[in-house]
UniProtKB/Swiss-Prot annotation:
InterPro entries: EGF-like_dom (IPR000742). It is found in: Secreted. It comes from Rabbit fibroma virus (strain Kasza) (RFV). PROSITE patterns: EGF_1, EGF_3. This is Growth factor. Its main location: secreted. Residues 29-73 form the EGF-like domain. Residues 1-19 form the signal peptide. Disulfide bonds join 33-47, 41-61, 63-72. Keywords: Disulfide bond, EGF-like domain, Glycoprotein, Growth factor, Secreted, Signal. Pfam families: EGF.
Length: 80
């Protein structure tokens, strides 16, 4: 779960601090998943990978509206 929180924080920084060196560092390390993770995200979620160190590649999902969970496996029926 800590990895997911780190990824969420990094993505927030990526969008909020787009003109700083931190943004460039993050963009270099976040990529759309390759075929190894083709079916990793469920319900049409988009898979990305992030290199957390020189060796580890961690996949994560960005879910479509009304879906949530680490792999977009849960439907969120709450409407706002």
């Amino acid at each position: 779960m800590a990895t997911r929180n780190l990824v969420a924080s990094l993505l927030c920084i990526m969008y909020a601090v787009h003109a700083m060196n931190d943004y460039l560092y993050i963009v270099k390390h976040v990529k759309v998943c390759n075929h190894d993770y083709e079916n990793y995200c469920l319900n049409n979620g988009t898979c990305f990978t992030i290199a957390l160190d020189n060796v580890s590649i961690t996949p994560f999902c960005v879910c479509r509206i009304n879906y949530e969970g680490s792999r977009c496996q849960f439907i969120n029926l709450v409407t706002y």
